[in-house]
């Protein structure tokens, strides 16, 4: 019997930020997933940027083969993805939420989309539309303004991610005849660095400055310095750290919701279940004076990757003995 599969893909989650990680965060659902499955602790993104990483993951091709190096590039409609293969094998391939497709093809092998994306699907978006959608957070979606608004409060990221999980739960409450391959895409814990107030205050109490937060290392090259936010006050760095941890904990809660709904769904169907979690890239969160991705520092390029369920060994951590990446052969062996 074909297993039902759910892949939960977050955006910009550095795996150092989790329970037991270098930067501890309360992530009980991710910890349970790791205990019950196989975690790849040396997993890396093929490119520390959203669209190149995601298209590499779907196609199994590195960015230098896809030709996708920026968030404005488009995966050709003629490029097959593992979703095409799964649909051919009889699966209903469902996208719930984010994937950051650019261009007219908003499927690339998905036979169904249940919730919209967070970001634009084209190359131009009117400024007034952005301001209407994101309000005071409009500029914080970009690298050079991502720390202009930080702290605890209402966030379009949190609102969007909650909507995605609502849509997933509604979809899983319905009967489906075909085997299911469901990809859940959230935008968190991507900046803006604004978390639910209670989570922000929780982590602000213990927030610490990264050792390299001032970014004055003499060996940084011109590209790395171009990514820096110079002269950032210490309290802003601490607020970014606290908000990012709060966003990670919020994402962990969504992982728990997704897994609980998926377990009920597969139990009702009497089918084997496979659940996976990963992110497209990480976030330096102020280390070396850099926020977000686009650098090859460890917190930017390492990603969480863990699978549990049918056919997956439990309690098997792969810690640093060999590396893997999200553009490797794993999607094509699902």
Predicted regions and their residues:
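Formylglycine-dependent sulfatase
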Residues: 1-334
């Amino acid at each position: 019997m074909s297993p039902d599969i759910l892949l939960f893909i977050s955006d910009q989650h550095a795996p150092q930020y989790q329970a037991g990680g270098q930067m501890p965060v309360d992530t009980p659902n991710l910890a349970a997933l790791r205990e019950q499955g196989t975690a790849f602790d040396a997993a890396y993104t093929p490119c520390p940027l959203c669209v190149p990483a995601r298209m590499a993951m779907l196609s199994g091709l590195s960015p230098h083969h896809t030709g996708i190096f920026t968030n404005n590039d488009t995966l050709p409609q003629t490029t097959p993805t593992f979703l095409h293969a799964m649909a051919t094998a009889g699966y209903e391939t469902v996208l719930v939420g984010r994937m950051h497709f650019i261009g007219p093809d908003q499927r690339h092998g998905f036979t169904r989309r249940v919730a919209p994306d967070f970001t634009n699907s084209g190359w131009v978006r009117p400024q007034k539309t952005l301001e209407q959608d994101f309000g005071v957070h409009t500029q914080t979606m970009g690298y050079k303004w991502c720390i202009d608004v930080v702290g605890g409060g209402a966030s379009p990221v949190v609102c969007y991610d909650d909507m995605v999980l609502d849509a997933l739960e509604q979809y899983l409450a319905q009967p489906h005849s075909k085997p299911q391959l469901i990809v859940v895409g959230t935008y968190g814990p991507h900046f803006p660095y604004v978390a639910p107030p209670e989570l922000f205050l929780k982590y602000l109490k213990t927030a610490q400055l990264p050792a390299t937060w001032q970014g004055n290392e003499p060996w940084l090259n011109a590209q790395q310095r171009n990514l820096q936010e110079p002269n950032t006050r210490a309290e802003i760095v601490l607020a970014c750290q606290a908000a990012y941890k709060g966003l990670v904990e919020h994402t962990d809660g969504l992982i728990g919701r997704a897994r609980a709904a998926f377990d009920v769904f597969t139990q009702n169907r009497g089918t084997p279940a496979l659940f996976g979690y990963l992110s497209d890239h990480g976030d330096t969160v102020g280390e070396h004076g850099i926020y977000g991705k686009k650098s090859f520092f460890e917190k930017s390029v390492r990603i969480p990757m863990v699978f549990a369920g049918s056919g997956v060994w439990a309690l098997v951590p792969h810690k640093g003995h060999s590396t893997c990446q999200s553009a490797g052969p794993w999607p094509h062996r699902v």
